[in-house]
A protein has these predicted regions:
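Helix-adjacent hinge/juxtasegments
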Residues: 48-85
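C-terminal binding/interaction regions
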Residues: 2-11, 89-169
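Short, structured coil segments at secondary-structure junctions
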Residues: 25, 78-79, 99
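Structural motif
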Residues: 38-47
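Glycine-rich phosphate/diphosphate-binding loop of Rossmann-like nucleotide-binding domains
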Residues: 1-25, 29
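A short beta-strand-loop structural module common to alpha/beta enzyme folds
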Residues: 28-39
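Alpha-helical segments flanking ligand/cofactor-binding loops in enzyme cores
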Residues: 20, 47, 51, 73, ...
Length: 169
């Protein structure tokens, strides 16, 4: 798989170690910076990596900053991105299995190197469970990206519930 990888200055060292892990696992790594521990702004790094996923230039992205929160918020501003801030293997697996997350965010100030490695490996080897409630919920997330209230729309037919009700009268 092609994995976009980015970090700010606080996540730089972890990014370098994760890049090695990904390469060892046979993934193509798109290193999108930063390339030093010099202070930088995480939105400048999160956006291009998330956009690479949204534009299908990367299959997934892994973003790292001190808390993981800034990267997560920025990535989730990009249409088509479902970024998940994960702190353990269970949240990594659930974000993929139930939410079809395509961007993994990590907190370098919180997680140790071995745990980060396990989270990344677990996240990349867990597949989405298509169909049923999880797929419906992911479609509802896409409605939100379009500025629509998912409670007002039938995601199976794309019609507003009021419109569907009017058609049945």
């Amino acid at each position: 798989m092609k994995i976009a990888l980015a970090a700010d200055h606080r996540g730089h060292a972890a990014k370098e170690r994760i890049a090695i892990l990904l390469s060892e696992q046979g993934h193509e790594v798109l290193d999108m910076g930063t390339n030093s521990a010099k202070s930088c702004d995480y939105p400048d790094l999160a956006y291009p990596a998330a956009k690479a996923v949204a534009d299908s230039k990367a299959d997934f992205a892994v973003l790292i900053c001190g808390s993981g929160i800034g990267m997560d918020i920025c990535a989730n501003k990009v249409d088509g991105v479902r970024a998940a801030l994960c702190h353990d293997e269970l949240t990594a697996q659930m974000s993929r299995r139930h939410n079809n997350a395509n961007v993994l965010c990590l907190a370098s100030d919180v997680l140790g190197e071995e745990l980060m490695r396990r989270i990344v490996s677990s996240w990349l080897t867990t597949d989405f469970e298509p169909g049923g409630r999880h797929e419906r919920r992911v479609r509802k997330m896409a409605w939100i990206e379009q500025g629509r209230d998912p409670a007002l729309y039938d995601v199976d037919d794309g019609l507003a519930k009021d419109d569907r009700d009017a058609d049945s009268r």
